[in-house]
Amino acid sequence: MEPSFWHEKWQLQQIGFHQNQVNPFLVKYWSHIGLNENTEVFVPLCGKSLDMFYLAEQRHTVLGCELNTLAVEQFFTDNGLTYQVNHTDEHVVFSTDQVTLYQGDIFTLPKSATASISGFYDRAALIAWPEEMRQQYVKALAALIPANVSGLLITLDYLQETLKGPPFAVSPRWVESYLTPYFDVELLECVDVLADNPRFMNKHVPWLNEAVYKLTRKS
């Protein structure tokens, strides 16, 4: 999957993956991570997610990484936030006092950028990748998360042959196979959300399971 795919989606505003409300699992389970106020939370492939605004409202500082410039700019403008822009070798850095978004490739994000995080949140990153790239992403994510840091992972699972991703189906077995080498994994909840997703219903997808996991980076 080439970067041009995502750039085109944002340019055409074909962003069905963007949710117009905070994810219910985030609201329900974020307290399970047990972070204090004023701690930093990493959000990979963040888009312009309202979930970041929610995390900021919980008095965390938010560190995101997003490939597309328009997505980053829209996050700040949609929320009425004035930002500053700086540059690193590989990324353009948009920041306010509480939110810093690295615009660029997550695979070139340096470990130093996430060295001080205390938590992380992945709702739309893991499920954005087809199989081979998803495995590469897991390795990249694990490299960016310091030891013993916990976060939430939200996945979708369905019969992949019934719908062309993204989002791509990620099963509990896949999570078990590919994340447990790097993370302790705890399934918190899994529910069928097909009735809330017309796109999947219109394609006659028989079921759509949304799951939330607590991940803790192994030492």
Swiss-Prot record:
NCBIfam families associated with the record: PRK13255.1, TMPT_Se_Te
Gene3D superfamilies in the cross-refs: Vaccinia Virus protein VP39
Domain of life: Bacteria
Keyword vocabulary terms for this entry: Cytoplasm, Methyltransferase, S-adenosyl-L-methionine, Transferase
Gene expressing this chain: tpm
Name of the protein this chain belongs to: Thiopurine S-methyltransferase
Top-level enzyme category: transferase
Compartments where located: Cytoplasm
Principal cellular location given in the protein's record: cytoplasm
One GO MF term: thiopurine S-methyltransferase activity
Residue positions binding S-adenosyl-L-methionine: W10, L45, E66, R123
Pfam family, one: TPMT
Database matches in SUPFAM superfamilies: S-adenosyl-L-methionine-dependent methyltransferases
GO biological process: methylation; response to metal ion
Enzyme Commission number(s) from the entry: 2.1.1.67
Signal peptide range in chain numbering: none
Chemical reaction(s) catalysed: S-adenosyl-L-methionine + a thiopurine = S-adenosyl-L-homocysteine + a thiopurine S-methylether
UniProt family annotation: Belongs to the class I-like SAM-binding methyltransferase superfamily. TPMT family.
Gene Ontology cellular-component terms listed: cytoplasm
